[in-house]
C-alpha cells in the first residue's frame, strides 16, 4: 500500500515549533474569520480583520517552516 507507507513515515521536520504555531494560528484565524462572517455581532469587522491578520501571520510561519526544512546537499552548494 503506497498510502500506508507514506502515512507511516510522516514527520513534521526539523522545525516542529513553527509547524505547531502555524497550525494553531490557522485554526484561531479561521474561527475568528467565520465568527465575524456568520455570527450576528455588532463588532463583526473586528473579528474579520483580526482573523485575516492572524491568517497572514500564519502564512509567514508556514513559509519559515518550509524554508527551514529544505535540504540541499553539499555537492550542490559547491563548498
Curated annotation (Swiss-Prot):
**Where are the bilayer-spanning segments?**
17-37, 46-66
The source's superkingdom equals Eukaryota
Q: What induces it?
A: Induced by FOXA1 in well-differentiated colorectal cancer (CRC) cells.
Q: Enumerate the UniProt keywords alphabetically.
A: Endoplasmic reticulum, Membrane, Transmembrane, Transmembrane helix
GO CC, any one term: endoplasmic reticulum membrane
Instruction: Please give the InterPro entries that the UniProt record associates with this protein.
Output: TMEM238
Keyword Endoplasmic reticulum present in the record's keywords: the answer is: yes
The principal localisation class reads endoplasmic reticulum
Keyword match Membrane:
yes
What does the UniProt entry say about where the protein is found?
A: Endoplasmic reticulum membrane
Q: Which biological process annotations from GO are given for this protein?
A: intrinsic apoptotic signaling pathway in response to endoplasmic reticulum stress
Its quaternary structure? Interacts with BRI3BP.
Other remarks in the entry: The TMEM238L transcript is unstable, and this instability is partly mediated through a conserved region containing AU-rich sequences in the TMEM238L 3'UTR. Cancer cells lacking this conserved region display decreased proliferation and clonogenicity.
> What is known about what this protein does?
May play a role in inducing apoptosis during endoplasmic reticulum (ER) stress and in the inhibition of proliferation and tumorigenicity.
Q: What's this protein's name? A: Transmembrane protein 238-like
